[in-house]
């Protein structure tokens, strides 16, 4: 049995010696603490705590001995043994997974189908009816086919306006006649629909009376037999009156009234739509929560049926604007598929807004050190095509466009993805030398 000593014994041992300090001497030993008559067992956690406190106490004793001239070396505690890490089992087979877009459990809600235009069978005079919506998945998956293809409506204005040169050269001779303008869009540029914008009604432009503007709507209805959308000037005070009068003269044709928004009298527009058999374009500005709010008010406050609501979440031009527009539309469509019944409606895009970016129509960059932008005759239409195609992938159904080349290219791409146009198979494995 090892001999036990107290710290006082060590002090007494050197009391009669002329020793000021001990150098190169290590005193090894264990410190015991008598706990007396403690009962209740010795908990492992208590043991660990006492061990830590004992080590601290030993250090204090060593420092105290040094103060009296007897430095005491304290050996560092041994590092605890570390168990070797177990080797991860080798993976023999990958976990089986299958992507079945037609049967994704979270996508349990179908997008509402909304018709635009009444044929004679429906009580109108349109030659065809356009159907939007009905999707059960994101667009263009071959194993989850879209029930209705994308549609394009080409813009017409009730007065001559300033347009980019690349656009204007296609319409210059008809810009003073909305009826002829609409007819050219249908007969030459293959428009699925026509959007007539009554911008002259703006009090800051011509302040055309609503009654006179309604005559322009009648002119367009007589010039073409495709469904039409009717837009105001964007003036929140004037638009409800203008759209109500336009709805009256086009009664029974099931036009799309563009648009109801939170910053104007949406109830008046909804009332006109219900009274004269039209659809409502629910327009918000890149805000999904505002879109939900407006849709909810149209349904709950104004009693607009679900099959008469189309959303326009706003389209911004290429750059950050397109990023926001795409993300907003995709979030809306995913939320709708997952059951948000305030968002389960087809979407419309003002793709013409692409021409609002100066890069689409300017001759060249205003910065001398900038790179060459290329010919605007190509650049502008491509700007509009990319805007529309991006939003088509996000789930957009209806495109409001202007340049005939943009219309033709977007229709060809979306109809090919839809399955309407057969194309030659491309060897994607030989992508370097493939001709597309």
From Swiss-Prot:
Write the gene name.
cdhD2
Pfam families given for it?
CdhD (PF03599)
Listed Gene3D superfamilies: Dihydropteroate synthase-like (3.20.20.20)
Q: Name one GO biological process term.
A: methanogenesis, from acetate
Q: Does the keyword Ribonucleoprotein apply?
A: no
Function noted in UniProt: Part of a complex that catalyzes the reversible cleavage of acetyl-CoA, allowing growth on acetate as sole source of carbon and energy. Probably maintains the overall quaternary structure of the ACDS complex.
Protein name as it appears in the record: Acetyl-CoA decarbonylase/synthase complex subunit delta 2
| Lineage, broadest ranks | Archaea, Methanobacteriati, Methanobacteriota, Stenosarchaea group, Methanomicrobia
Pathway(s) it belongs to: One-carbon metabolism; methanogenesis from acetate
Family label:
Belongs to the CdhD family.
Subunit and interaction comment = Heterodimer of delta and gamma chains. The ACDS complex is made up of alpha, epsilon, beta, gamma and delta chains with a probable stoichiometry of (alpha(2)epsilon(2))(4)-beta(8)-(gamma(1)delta(1))(8) (Potential).
Say yes or no: keyword Cell cycle present. Answer: no
Q: Keywords for this entry?
A: Methanogenesis
